[in-house]
């Protein structure tokens, strides 16, 4: 198995596995060039955050404070807003040939969310040909966070 990841959006851009004839085939949906990921908005393979899924009417209340987020999906906030993590550049550190750590720092108020936050995504290719993804977030004040990966398998 071969996995290709870009730091633009923390995206898995290809997963090559052998087919029944031993030919390597890509099994994730995506584009052929980084320029396509930049110019054609999509979530293909991306790390989604600060908050994956929809937030109703782009509003939430935390510790008695109401927050209004951008409404980018039929009146709701989807996947962290129009400039969510999927459109950000992560710092990348190759820990070893099987492990990559991606880090993104979002400032207080980015896309309307409270708190400075440092998010880490550890992607590991396991010995049994699985991709293990672990998420970690540290913040300096109460906030909401719900990260995921948006790879679509063929």
Question: Where are the language model's segments positioned?
Answer:
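Surface-exposed acidic/polar loop and edge beta-strand patches at domain peripheries
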Residues: 1-154
């Amino acid at each position: 198995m071969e996995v290709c990841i870009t730091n633009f959006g923390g995206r898995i851009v290809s997963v090559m596995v052998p087919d029944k004839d031993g030919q390597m085939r890509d099994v994730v949906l995506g584009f052929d060039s980084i320029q396509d990921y930049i110019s054609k908005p999509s979530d293909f393979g991306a790390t989604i955050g600060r908050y994956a899924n929809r937030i109703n009417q782009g509003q939430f209340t935390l510790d008695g404070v109401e927050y209004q987020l951008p409404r980018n999906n039929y009146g709701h906030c989807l996947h962290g807003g129009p400039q969510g993590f999927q459109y950000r550049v992560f710092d990348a550190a190759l820990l070893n040939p099987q492990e990559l750590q991606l880090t993104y720092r979002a400032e207080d108020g980015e896309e309307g969310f409270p708190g400075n936050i440092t998010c880490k995504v550890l992607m590991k290719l396991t010995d049994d040909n699985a991709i293990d993804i672990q998420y970690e977030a540290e913040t300096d004040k109460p906030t909401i966070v719900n990260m995921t990966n948006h790879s679509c398998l063929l």
